[in-house]
Amino acid sequence: TPEEFLECCRVFQENGIDTPIGANRWWLETFVFAQAYADLYNGGTTEAEIAALNSGEAKYSDYMRPGFQFLQTLIDEGYVDAEKALVSEAIEGEGPDFLAGKTPIVMAYWGAANSETAYGKTDFEMQVVGFPSSRGQMPVIPITGWGVGANADHLEDALEVINVITSDEALQLYSETNRVISPSKNVKVDCVPSLRPLNNRIEEGVYVLGSNAGMKVEQWGNTCRIVRELLGGATVEQCMESFDRLQ
């Protein structure tokens, strides 16, 4: 939960780790999504809640506020270095301290479980877990999609290529080679040990989406941009006003 996560950070700091969370300007919105949408995606009322957001009956700011308040607490307590995060690229900003053991917590995509392709080879074991939420550790899943232009010169060829790339056979090969979390219900794979805590939650059907084409307000990019406003000194309520303007 958020409270348990804050307690972990407090203990880290008491034991000499000044900044427990390595952050950058791209990925802090993951904390927000986990808290904002834990109930929306896992409470059995997903369609109705999204319809209310799209119609304006409900406000995105009401969903986002707890996550932004949580980020503000991380900043105020010194668990995140806001000034550094605001100017840091993904992995480059926090990577060296993570490898050196100075920063125990970082945000990363699942592929970072194979850390040699992300942070570099580690001399410690790591675990990939979900983000803190009212429902416990929460996987945040950004959707990656494929698209073909309707007027493409080689439309049929392009569609055929996508069909091959996204086939069960291709996804099985990809998953087995990289030992990552399965991208398809039709593909079973033994992921690397560090991913198992996250994989277990996903197999239980517990997760939130970081992107959703069914929402009229684009999620990932807009939230990332407004998080940067917070890192730059805006108040939580000023950030909520930014969401209200989008809606």
Which residue stretches match the model-derived regions?
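Short helix-loop capping/hinge motifs at secondary-structure junctions, enriched
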Residues: D39, G43, E77-V80, N151-A158
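Short helix-initiation/N-cap motifs at beta->coil->alpha
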Residues: P2-L6, K84-L99
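Glycine-centered hinge/linker elements that transmit conformational signals in sensory
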Residues: C9-V11, L53-A85
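Extracytoplasmic/periplasmic solute-binding protein
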Residues: E4-G56, T103
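Paired acidic/hydrophobic, glycine-rich loop segments that form the ligand-binding mouth/hinge
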Residues: P104-Y109
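Short, solvent-exposed loop/beta-turn-alpha elements that line the ligand-binding surface or hinge
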Residues: L40-P66, A118-G120, G130-P139, R196, ...
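Extracytoplasmic/periplasmic substrate-recognition and gating elements
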Residues: T117-V180
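Conserved C-terminal helix/tail region of periplasmic/extracytoplasmic solute-binding proteins
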Residues: G16, R201-Q247
